[in-house]
Amino acid sequence: MTEVNTQPEVNIGLVGHVDHGKTTLVQALSGSWTDQHSEEMKRGISIRLGYADATFRRCPGVDAPECYTVDEECEDGSESEPIRTVSFVDAPGHETLMATMLSGASIMDGAVLVVSATEDVPQAQTEEHLMALDLIGIENIVIAQNKVDLVDRDRAVDNYRQIQEFVEGTVAEDAPIVPVSAQQEVNMDLLIDAIESEIPTPDRDPGESARMYAARSFDINRPGATAAELKGGVVGGSLVSGELSVGDGLEIRPGREVDEEGQTEWRPLETTVRSLQAGSNDVESARPGGLLGVGTGLDPSLTKGDALAGQVAGEPGTLPPTRNEFEMQVDLLDRVIGSEEGDDGDVEDINTGEPLMLTVGTATTVGAVTSAREGECEVSLKRPVCAEKGAQIAINRRVGARWRLIGVGTLS
C-alpha cells in the first residue's frame, strides 16, 4: 500500500450558518479518523480548534468522481490509495462567534461553504461568512448543498437556484455546488472530487523563516505533578511558512505583559521547541498545513487557558514588530450584513473615538479610533498585536448588542 504523509498539507475552512451541518460533514469526511481527538486527550495534548484531519483516497481502476473515498477499503474489497491529507477548520456558524470564524479564516487555504437545502438562501451567517471570505481574499471555494435527503426534488432544485443567485457577483460565483447528505454520507465522492480540483495545496517556500499563528495554548500537567514530571507549556496553531523542527529556537510575540516601575510593557518570550505533534503523530519537523502542537520550554503558567492564543511564533529575530497602535487603509462594506434582528443598514464612516473590534491573524483585540479620515484611520489597541505592514484586518463595529463585520483594513 502506498504510504501517505499523514501531516495535513492544506487547511480547509467549513463555513456557513448554524445548524446547516458543518460538523456532521466533517465527521463524514474524516471517516475512520474521527476518534483521534480522544487519543489526544489521553496523551494530554488536545489541539482541537474545531479541527479534524481527513485523508482523501482513490480506488484503483475506477473513474472519477466515483473513485474518491475516505475509506481504506474500496467497494470491491481492494485497498484504496491515499492521495493527500487535509485539515478541516470547523468555523462556528453562530453570529456571536464571528470573531472566532475570522481568526480561523486567517489560516484557511480554501473553504467549503455549507448551505442547507431545507432553508431559504441566504440565512444570516451564510451571508456574513461569504462576505468574510471575500474580504479576507479566500478564493478557492466549494459549495456543499447539504441535507438534500430531507427535501423533495423540486425543493432541492429551487434551493440550488437560490444558491446560484446568492453567489452571483461574489468570490464564490464560479464555485461548484455539490448536493450532498452528510448524515447519509451521500455524494461524498463528488465533494472530494470538487475539493481536489478547486482547493489545491499552495506552493510554499521551505526556505522562508518559520512563522506560526497561535490559536490555542495550554498547560498539559496534571495537578500534583512533581517538579521532575513537569512539562513545558504547549502552543497549538498553524504554521503558515517555513519549517519547524525539534530543537529550534522560538520567539513568541507580543509575549507577556510585565510591570516595570509602574509602567506596563509587553516583552517577547524566547524558548526552544521540545516536541512537535502534527495530526495525531509525534514528528521531528513540521511544514505548513493542519494544526500543530508545539511543546516548549516555557513555564506552563504562561500558556494555560489559551493565554497565548492570537500571538505569533517563529524563528527568533524574524517576527514583525509588536504594535500598540497602527494606521490602516479602510475598505468598508456598503451595508451591515448577517443580522437576524433585521437591523441591517448602511455602513456609516468610522468616527474618531469609537471602539472597533479588530481581528489580525488569529488575534482579536479592541481598538479606540484616535483619528479618522476618509479611507483611513488610526487606532490605539487595548491589547497589542504582532503584525506586519500589509496585514489584512477584519473590522467589526458595535451594532445594537452585537459586533458586526463592517469592512476590512490594510495595515499601513
Curated annotation (Swiss-Prot):
Q: What is its EC number?
A: 3.6.5.3
What would be one Gene Ontology cellular-component term for the protein? cytosol
Q: Which CDD domains match?
A: eIF2_gamma, eIF2_gamma_II, eIF2_gamma_III
Q: Which PROSITE patterns match?
A: G_TR_2
Q: Where is this region: G2?
A: 44-48
Ranges for region G5: 181-183
A biological process (GO) annotation for this entry?
Answer: formation of translation preinitiation complex
Name this polypeptide is given? Translation initiation factor 2 subunit gamma
What is the organism field in this record? Halorubrum lacusprofundi (strain ATCC 49239 / DSM 5036 / JCM 8891 / ACAM 34)
